Amino acid sequence: MAQATKSGFNAGVQDYRLTYYTPDYTPKDTDLLACFRMTPQPGVPPEEAGAAVAAESSTGTWTTVWTDNLTDLDRYKGRCYDIEPVPNEDNQYFCFIAYPLDLFEEGSVTNVLTSLVGNVFGFKALRALRLEDIRFPVALIKTFQGPPHGITVERDKLNKYGRPLLGCTIKPKLGLSAKNYGRAVYECLRGGLDFTKDDENINSQPFMRWRDRFLFVQEAIEKAQAETNEVKGHYLNVTAGTCEEMMKRAEFAKEIGTPIVMHDFLTGGFTANTTLAKFCRDNGILLHIHRAMHAVIDRQKNHGIHFRVLAKCLRLSGGDHLHSGTVVGKLEGERGITMGFVDLMREDYVEEDRSRGIFFTQDYASMPGTMPVASGGIHVWHMPALVEIFGDDSCLQFGGGTLGHPWGNAPGATANRVALEACIQARNEGRNLAREGNDVIREACKWSPELAAACELWKEITFEFEAMDTL
């Protein structure tokens, strides 16, 4: 209960909704907007819970403090301006909050997330809380560099147009020596792939130190380029235990002429990622981003952060590629939801579309796009669906789907390249890949023994599990 004091303010505890629940508020163009899915504790009204989220993620604390008189809370407080029941869910609500622009440091994803997903997620009045979406205002967007280069510049660097890019994660992910690792890279690139990739947990272990890997891989890239007359690359993972070590590895990659490096942006952190992205832009290096740890954060429907938020934040922090799921492979991803955040990664302007989980219209103010990477449990039979779903501005990455070929790495790469080229030709001729995709692959098998062997090996492989990431 609040009470007046000699210092001229009402001390004590008062309901959050008295200050932070403002249903008559109309958000400004400069406000950062957030949509939370909240599950209040029994007995807590949704208006009080929504106001508590607004307070604890902006200017509020658990009690009135006299220093409130030293600032203009009306200018700086977050405002819960709308609450909607979540369809088909008991005691769950979408809570919409507007935050004034001045609450956030320019060009800092770290600062935005510290406010929005900080202490409030441990708040006792809430049983669960999930950040579903953010609308970054253009005024804030313009303070971020974004992707080092973006999709259009990457295409020009590679001189590859009119089709998705093809990649492969080198397997086994751990245990190879640097020389054998470089051999696998060469065979895959020579067989027809555009890129190969370090797995997310390859850093600098006793069996393969980073410098040795970088040198053998660069030798493989240059040899494959000379023999195919195509630009090739390998995502050298520069993620390290410290930012200083990460930048040392990135600098060495630049010195040996590698075209692209890689970072694990969630385990490495947004501050490290933004630092690396700025370096990559300054030095003409592409930046591939892996999302290791994302499912810990985004897989539960009622608590955490949705991946569309992480994807938006990564685009602002900086990344030319980002893993996005496959829809058809072994990793989580329902089609409508996945394509919603894929559009948020690569399009300049995305309209609100609740059917795809997009709660706000987002204008990126001409910021370059991030290319989605489809990776995880995919093989040649998936190629028509992947081309139809993701389109040209994507990277299709086959790890086991390349290296698991019965004839070896290079034939596995050739099988994937033939399947891709066949699908692109069929699409350009007006054929419907969703309906005729398997026929397209079978026809291509007649003139590619490598593809025929791959199709025979993986004809029975499916990953039929219900997607958890649904509306």
Curated annotation (Swiss-Prot):
GO terms for biological process: photorespiration; reductive pentose-phosphate cycle. The keyword Metal-binding applies. The record marks K330 as: Transition state stabilizer. Binds 1 Mg(2+) ion per subunit. Its EC number is 4.1.1.39. Its main location: other. One of its GO terms (molecular function) is ribulose-bisphosphate carboxylase activity. It catalyses: 2 (2R)-3-phosphoglycerate + 2 H(+) = D-ribulose 1,5-bisphosphate + CO2 + H2O; D-ribulose 1,5-bisphosphate + O2 = 2-phosphoglycolate + (2R)-3-phosphoglycerate + 2 H(+). Pfam families: RuBisCO_large, RuBisCO_large_N. The keyword Transferase does not apply. It is found in: Carboxysome. Its cofactor is Mg(2+). Mg(2+) binds at K197, D199, E200. The modification N6-carboxylysine is found at K197. GO terms for cellular component: carboxysome. RuBisCO catalyzes two reactions: the carboxylation of D-ribulose 1,5-bisphosphate, the primary event in carbon dioxide fixation, as well as the oxidative fragmentation of the pentose substrate in the photorespiration process. Both reactions occur simultaneously and in competition at the same active site. Heterohexadecamer of 8 large chains and 8 small chains; disulfide-linked. The disulfide link is formed within the large subunit homodimers. Belongs to the RuBisCO large chain family. Type I subfamily. The basic functional RuBisCO is composed of a large chain homodimer in a 'head-to-tail' conformation. In form I RuBisCO this homodimer is arranged in a barrel-like tetramer with the small subunits forming a tetrameric 'cap' on each end of the 'barrel'. This is Ribulose bisphosphate carboxylase large chain.
